[in-house]
Regions:
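Phosphate-binding P-loop
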Residues: 1-5
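Hydrophobic anchor at the beta1->P-loop junction of P-loop NTPases
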Residues: 10
Length: 188
């Protein structure tokens, strides 16, 4: 159930499940993940052009000057951004809080925004399980405490607690709510 030019926007703190949920939306429902651009180092099992477009900070700065981004931000010392070329029909995008604020401020009914929340303990465990060092995990948690303070989270269409859910359950809930929203829009 799709309308043209719709988008799912997923955000949340580090290791809240947003990237894995986006992958599940692709494999199970055919929602293509918009590939964002970043300057952060590639993790084990990540592939350039599949998970992110990995570029140098210099190239990212050039892309900003060339006005190639819908939104971009500096997060944990690395740049992240959504290029205009990656925004298309029926895509999902995983973004940080500033990107979420940018999309939320558009007030476009076709952009369905989600915030995934999970406890710090679970997120810390997930970070270690995916190969982050303890020091990096601690730094990310500390940074997230500042960034994701409750007053900083913009209005979103839906908040999902991903704490005790599998990635498939989170993706199913995102898809169900997305379809519900699209149905309401098409009936209005």
């Amino acid at each position: 159930m799709y309308l043209r030019n719709t988008m799912i926007v997923l955000s949340g703190a580090s290791a809240s499940g947003k990237t894995e949920a986006a992958k599940m939306l692709t494999s199970k429902y055919g929602i293509v993940k918009a590939i964002t651009t970043t300057t952060r180092p590639m993790r084990v099992n990540e592939v350039d052009g599949r998970d992110y477009f990995f570029v140098t900070k210099e190239r990212f700065q050039e892309m900003i000057k060339e006005d190639l981004f819908v939104e971009h931000t500096l997060y944990n010392g690395n740049y992240y951004g959504s290029t205009k070329s990656q925004i298309a029909d029926n895509r999902s995008v995983v973004i940080d809080l500033e990107g979420l604020k940018s999309y939320s401020s558009l007030n476009d009914k076709r952009i369905v925004t989600f915030y995934l929340s999970t406890s710090e303990d679970v997120r810390y465990r997930r970070m270690l399980e995916r190969g982050d060092s303890e020091a990096d995990a601690q730094r990310r948690l500390e940074n997230d405490r500042k960034i994701f303070a409750s007053g900083n989270i913009p209005n979103v269409n839906y908040r999902i607690d991903s704490e005790n859910k599998t990635i498939e359950q989170v993706a199913d809930e995102v898809y169900r709510l997305y379809c519900k929203t699209m149905k309401a829009i098409s009936n209005s």
